[in-house]
Amino acid sequence: MMVIRPVERSDVSALMQLASKTGGGLTSLPANEATLSARIERAIKTWQGELPKSEQGYVFVLEDSETGTVAGICAIEVAVGLNDPWYNYRVGTLVHASKELNVYNALPTLFLSNDHTGSSELCTLFLDPDWRKEGNGYLLSKSRFMFMAAFRDKFNDKVVAEMRGVIDEHGYSPFWQSLGKRFFSMDFSRADFLCGTGQKAFIAELMPKHPIYTHFLSQEAQDVIGQVHPQTAPARAVLEKEGFRYRNYIDIFDGGPTLECDIDRVRAIRKSRLVEVAEGQPAQGDFPACLVANENYHHFRVVLVRTDPATERLILTAAQLDALKCHAGDRVRLVRLCAEEKTA
């Protein structure tokens, strides 16, 4: 059974294996053991209530409960940009016009922005390619909404998610090549690694401070503004069906889109509800897949179950109850996996 649980110190080697499969561009999952260990430690301290809000971040893993294999990772940053500035570009417009010459030009322009400061962030979503089946991607991504719904007071009103931009298998980013490299004088992979390992001071020191006309970029770079990496397209679709939208903010490195949504308008958060759980043999039938989560902050668990999402009393097997760390009579959070039945 596939189960979402909080990360543990013993997961570091599994996270290193996952990091080696990302193909680059996933800044928050670098193949660096010291950085990953520090990330795990920060998550543990967040759960223990030892960190200020500006440093809090939760990390979860997707585990096969039968084999102990860690198949994926996802995370939530509680409030971005309160310690280090959180940069992106806002894609806007500057108008240059002359009535005398009968000239009017509306030029797409990139404006450096810290507009999302303080927002909660969905991040570090990666599923091992070998496990991209049977709804695992949906479970991994949407499990975070169950945690946010259960512990709403831990998070801010707006949620953002940076989507990985277009980058090829050799680490070539058209957007970086045309813009970032001119100011940072390093390859995309180097800048990505520095940022992922927490060495972010160079961003504020070197990045351009003035608006940038996109027409000055290569056509290849212009074409990838707001576009996602092919492997990230499914993750974008998942978030958009939950209510997230692209509001013309992009990543400063690869030009990938930043999606955003008011937390209380996220479908899975808004429609999730608490039901009593009982042990038994679940009813047979053509039921949709549903997310089921316990309400245990320190021992949070989420699984996928096929059931009636409108039920008031959820019947689970002993194995499912054990995976959820629940007992008969407990209340669990339930929501349909998708607005319409899908298979990952």
UniProtKB/Swiss-Prot annotation:
Molecular function terms from GO: arginine N-succinyltransferase activity; N-succinylarginine dihydrolase activity
Keyword presence, ATP-binding: no
InterPro entries, per database record: Acyl_CoA_acyltransferase, Arg_succinylTrfase_AstA/AruG, Arginine_N-succinylTrfase
Keyword Transferase: yes
EC number per UniProt: 2.3.1.109
Binding residues annotated for succinyl-CoA, in chain numbering: L125
GO terms, biological process: arginine catabolic process; arginine catabolic process to glutamate; arginine catabolic process to succinate
Domain of life: Bacteria
Induction trigger: By nitrogen starvation, and arginine. Induced at stationary phase by sigma S.
Pathway where this protein functions: Amino-acid degradation; L-arginine degradation via AST pathway; L-glutamate and succinate from L-arginine: step 1/5
Signal peptide: none
Alphabetical keyword list: Acyltransferase, Arginine metabolism, Stress response, Transferase
A Pfam family: AstA
Catalytic activity: succinyl-CoA + L-arginine = N(2)-succinyl-L-arginine + CoA + H(+)
Active site as annotated: H229
Gene3D superfamilies the record matches: 2.40.40.20, 3.40.630.30
EC category name: transferase
HAMAP family: AstA (MF_01171)
Role of this protein: Catalyzes the transfer of succinyl-CoA to arginine to produce N(2)-succinylarginine.
Similarity annotation: Belongs to the arginine N-succinyltransferase family.
Protein name: Arginine N-succinyltransferase
